[in-house]
């Protein structure tokens, strides 16, 4: 069984037992959270789409860790003008383990 969930403005296809990194969710480590924005639920050949959400469906997950992604380097340069600018960005994430899919 799998589900398509929406969190942090992105969509993820998840199955029970998977781990995934999503945009930061303010929760403690080992806390159980419920993701209610389920867009689709499928098992084998059958799939159920929501309009836009599947009514009564939810995904239970456990917070495994909180962290930061690797740095994305930004470099701006203007040729012949001796203008160079360095920058970087590290995005926060929450790692989840999917425990159950309720449809």
From Swiss-Prot:
GO biological process per UniProt: translation
Asked if Magnesium is a keyword of the record, the answer is no
Q: Which InterPro entries match?
A: bL21-like, bL21-like_sf, Ribosomal_bL21, Ribosomal_bL21_CS
Task: List the PROSITE patterns.
Answer: RIBOSOMAL_L21
The cysteines joined by S-S bonds are: none
One GO CC term on file? cytoplasm
The record's GO molecular-function terms, alphabetically, read: rRNA binding; structural constituent of ribosome
Residue stretches spanning the membrane:
none
Task: Give the record's keywords alphabetically.
Answer: Ribonucleoprotein, Ribosomal protein, RNA-binding, rRNA-binding
Q: Pfam families annotated for this entry?
A: Ribosomal_L21p
Sequence similarity: Belongs to the bacterial ribosomal protein bL21 family.
Q: Tell me, how does this one assemble?
A: Part of the 50S ribosomal subunit. Contacts protein L20.
- Role according to the record: This protein binds to 23S rRNA in the presence of protein L20.
Which protein are we looking at?
Large ribosomal subunit protein bL21
Source organism per entry reads Paraburkholderia phymatum (strain DSM 17167 / CIP 108236 / LMG 21445 / STM815) (Burkholderia phymatum)
């Amino acid at each position: 069984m799998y589900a398509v969930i929406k969190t942090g403005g992105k969509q993820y296809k998840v199955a029970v037992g998977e781990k995934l990194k999503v945009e930061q969710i303010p929760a403690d480590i080992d806390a159980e959270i419920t993701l209610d924005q389920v867009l689709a639920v499928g098992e084998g050949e059958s799939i159920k789409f929501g309009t836009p959400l599947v009514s009564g469906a939810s995904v239970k997950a456990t917070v495994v860790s909180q962290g930061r992604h690797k740095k994305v380097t930004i470099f701006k340069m203007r040729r012949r003008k001796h203008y160079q600018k360095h920058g970087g960005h590290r995005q926060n994430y929450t790692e989840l383990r999917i425990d159950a899919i309720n449809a």
